[in-house]
Amino acid sequence: MASNSLMSCGIAAVYPSLLSSSKSKFVSAGVPLPNAGNVGRIRMAAHWMPGEPRPAYLDGSAPGDFGFDPLGLGEVPANLERYKESELIHCRWAMLAVPGILVPEALGYGNWVKAQEWAALPGGQATYLGNPVPWGTLPTILAIEFLAIAFVEHQRSMEKDPEKKKYPGGAFDPLGYSKDPKKLEELKVKEIKNGRLALLAFVGFCVQQSAYPGTGPLENLATHLADPWHNNIGDIVIPFN
């Protein structure tokens, strides 16, 4: 009996088409077949590093969750929710910052490093794309930003639903993407992935500027492409002289 069952399993594994008929004698062998639920669970179990166990508190339900938490920072549920929110907010800021750095430099209006030099001058006037910014002195801008950000953060902190704090919808969804739940979940994953890429890009801009002070990312890239063997990160990290 056992040998018959094993033979049935072996044949079914090699010739799965034999199971397609409801009259097949191999159906009674109870061979488990993959189904949509199993495939979904397999995808959910994707790890950030093969062989590393997924923490129990990272179950794959959050957008972009691949079980990455080597320091165990999210073990406390309240902290985990706060980190999710903080990551998303920082991702959105980075996605605004990276194009804001690249586009003006690409248009020939200077780089983001030199754009800050006015703030170091007494009575310096801020400009944007060559035009003076109204109320563009440093103390005035700091006061406006402090009041504006304080108001927005206060309003956001009053929301008790963690999902609404991250995805408020309403006026922040003018195209109505949140009306389709399936589409919304897909967009959440795309947002967090693009946001993480933008965070890495901004860190790269900062490192590049520290290595080559006064240069923007596009200028630095052009210099590297002109002579890749001599203009690279190794030229700074490894002291040749």
From Swiss-Prot:
Residues annotated to bind chlorophyll b 2: 92, 133
Keyword field: Chlorophyll, Chloroplast, Chromophore, Magnesium, Membrane, Metal-binding, Phosphoprotein, Photosynthesis, Photosystem I, Plastid, Thylakoid, Transit peptide, Transmembrane, Transmembrane helix
TM annotation in the entry: 93-113, 132-152, 197-217
InterPro entries recorded: Chloro_AB-bd_pln, Chloroa_b-bind
UniProt keyword DNA damage present: no
Free-text remark on how the cofactor is bound: Binds at least 14 chlorophylls (8 Chl-a and 6 Chl-b) and carotenoids such as lutein and neoxanthin.
UniProt GO cellular component terms: chloroplast; chloroplast envelope; chloroplast thylakoid; chloroplast thylakoid membrane; photosystem I; plastoglobule; thylakoid
Positions with a binding annotation for chlorophyll a 4: 194
Binding residues annotated for chlorophyll b 3, in chain numbering: 153
Positions bound to chlorophyll b 4: 156
Sequence positions that bind chlorophyll b 1: 48
Post-translational modifications: Photoregulated by reversible phosphorylation of its threonine residues.
SUPFAM superfamilies, alphabetized: Chlorophyll a-b binding protein (SSF103511)
Residues annotated as transit peptide in the record: 1-35
Subcellular location: Plastid, Chloroplast thylakoid membrane
PANTHER family associated with the record: CHLOROPHYLL A/B BINDING PROTEIN (PTHR21649)
Record remark on domains: The N-terminus of the protein extends into the stroma where it is involved with adhesion of granal membranes and post-translational modifications; both are believed to mediate the distribution of excitation energy between photosystems I and II.
Function statement: The light-harvesting complex (LHC) functions as a light receptor, it captures and delivers excitation energy to photosystems with which it is closely associated.
Additional detail: Light emission at 684 nm upon excitation at 410 and 470 nm.
Description of how the protein assembles with itself and partners: The LHC complex consists of chlorophyll a-b binding proteins. Red-emitting heterodimer with LHCA4. Interacts with LHCA5.
This protein's name: Chlorophyll a-b binding protein 6, chloroplastic
